A protein has these predicted regions:
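Conserved nucleotide-binding/hydrolysis micro-motifs of P-loop NTPases
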Residues: 31, 80-86, 206-208
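Active-site neighborhood of HAD-like aspartate-dependent phosphohydrolases
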Residues: 145-198
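Substrate-recognition element of Asp-dependent hydrolases with the DxDx(T/V) motif
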Residues: 185-222, 234-241
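A short, structured active-site edge motif that brings together acidic residues
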Residues: 5, 77-83, 229-246
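Conserved substrate/cofactor phosphate-moiety recognition/catalytic segment
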Residues: 5-61
């Protein structure tokens, strides 16, 4: 029995294991039906790999009971991962299949499904009836085939001064003000560009979801920011509400970064995230990027 979150790599592992052990894979996603329907397919004369999430004691019990009924051994293989890495793998799978990341999870798993699975998960125990439990750490997605490097820039509180604003972000271009002296900021950014980095903005703009400002208002403010800096670079932003998180694009989710990584063949290990908030630091950690605060970056 395989156990693990969605997008933890179970199906890839089960395919390899099936070849090695001459086993039959039972997966409700491919076969259809209910767990009880899968149980009916099990007999004593063959080896089976139960390839579903099998997250809870309750969902595992029906198969353990069947094994006991047939007097056969049942072992568990727990593919250990965290939800954040599973989300990155899910978005990678999405991009490989569709050449696009659907930030709401359309055509694949939504973030809501993954968050729910974390709540449902119960770590497997021998007390459930397994003869053996093997733990395998899930493979962490890397981007070693990409060679370009990037400075990812948060916008509000990093490039723009916002503490004095009512909403803590500008709602019209007249409110846009650079965080530091223009020459200081431009010199620093150009230094990185000359060192071979591209610049890419990533911003949470939940004011759109709250109907405080429009997409056009956000674009106007972003364009004004670049005009004041006198530097051109792409900026992506998430328009969804801050809570509850139902998308892959709101930082610290990795969607905006992955979109840029695939498009520009960026290696995050060679890149830098500059931001002023915890979600910026967390975003960097999830993708193995160096993190810097605005004060450290614009020295």
């Amino acid at each position: 029995m395989l156990i693990g979150y969605p997008a933890s790599g179970k199906s890839t592992y089960s395919s390899e294991l099936a070849k090695e052990t001459n086993s039959i894979i039972l997966n409700r996603d491919t076969i259809g039906g209910t767990l009880k329907d899968l149980v009916k397919l099990i007999n004593k004369d063959k080896n089976y790999i139960l390839d579903n999430t099998n997250l809870s004691i309750k969902t595992r019990k029906i198969f353990i009971d069947k094994a006991n009924e047939l007097n056969i051994e049942i072992n568990a293989i727990y593919i250990k991962s965290n939800i954040e890495d599973c989300m990155i793998r899910c978005m990678n799978r999405m991009y490989q299949k569709h050449s696009k990341i659907y930030f709401d999870g359309e055509n694949d798993l939504s973030p809501v499904v993954l968050f729910k699975s974390r709540k449902e998960f119960e770590e497997p125990s021998l007390d459930e009836g397994f003869k053996e439990i093997k733990i395998i750490n899930a493979h962490k997605l890397e981007f070693n085939n990409f060679n370009n490097k990037c400075v990812f820039l948060d916008i509000d509180g990093t490039l723009r001064k916002t503490d004095h604003l009512i909403n803590k972000y500008p709602i019209k271009k007249e409110e846009v003000e650079l965080l530091f002296d223009k020459d200081k900021m431009k010199t620093t950014l150009n230094k990185y560009v000359n060192d071979g980095y591209m610049l890419y903005g990533v911003s949470n703009q939940s004011g759109i979801g709250k109907n405080i400002l429009s997409v056009d208002d956000v674009i106007d403010c972003m364009n004004e920011t670049k005009r004041l800096l006198d530097i051109e670079f792409p900026i992506s932003f998430c328009s969804h509400n801050s809570f509850p998180i139902k998308c892959y694009c709101r930082k610290p989710q990795s969607g905006l970064f992955l979109e840029a990584i695939y498009k520009y063949e960026i290696n995050p290990f060679l890149s830098i995230m500059v931001g002023d908030r915890t979600e910026d630091k967390t975003s960097a950690k999830r993708l193995n990027m160096k993190y810097m605060t605005p004060n450290d970056f614009f020295i």
